[in-house]
């Protein structure tokens, strides 16, 4: 969410609003940050895994996963282009 919010902030402000975040008089960056927190809280409250390691992804698989994701056709619909290095950084953050 944070990665894409830089290029399509209005989408993420709408998500934040839908999650109950107060948007009045606040910067997009503040609202988006609170929206991301709200989504993380919802995920945890639902008992869903929040880390790749919780679903059995080994850390050593992350570079290959990033390379595969960089050429996966769905990535071309992403609002912000991503390199395999950027994808790897995101995967490491959620591992």
Report the location of each language-model feature:
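Gly/Pro-rich interdomain helix-loop hinge
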Residues: 1-61
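Short, amphipathic C-terminal "tail helix"
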Residues: 58-95
